[in-house]
């Protein structure tokens, strides 16, 4: 099965450029320019990875990361012009897996996407999902509805 990548970037040229840079990797793409569109597709599809702009016309990407983390551990890579240390730390602490500042190299983006998917695959081997619970055996923890519980 092809990996399903969600690109949420309001700059149409960059949105299309990201898809073109990653197209040879046999991913299936959902491309949107607003958070509302992204929310809808996340409800309908099992997205493998999210590439998310921080500054969007209908909201803040970092707030959206927090929203996603309430229900999902999908890898999220933030893409933004916000390059101050406090911005990077805030994004990562909100739950993003990676933070890339614009402008960025599309080759570096491809590599970082690959790393996140590889990490997700490795984590899946050490986890199990059952009836809305996610069990992570290597960390001895589980999630219910995105909230962590320790055993």
Q: PLM features: residue spans?
A:
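Structural motif
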Residues: 130, 137, 144-145
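N-terminal/domain-start alpha-helical segments
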Residues: 1-118
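The C-terminal output helix
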Residues: 115-127
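Conserved short-loop catalytic and cofactor-binding motifs
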Residues: 26, 128, 146
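Conserved small/polar residues in nucleotide/adenosyl-binding loops
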Residues: 150-151
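A structure-centric signal for secondary-structure junctions around beta-strands
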Residues: 2, 73, 124-125, 130
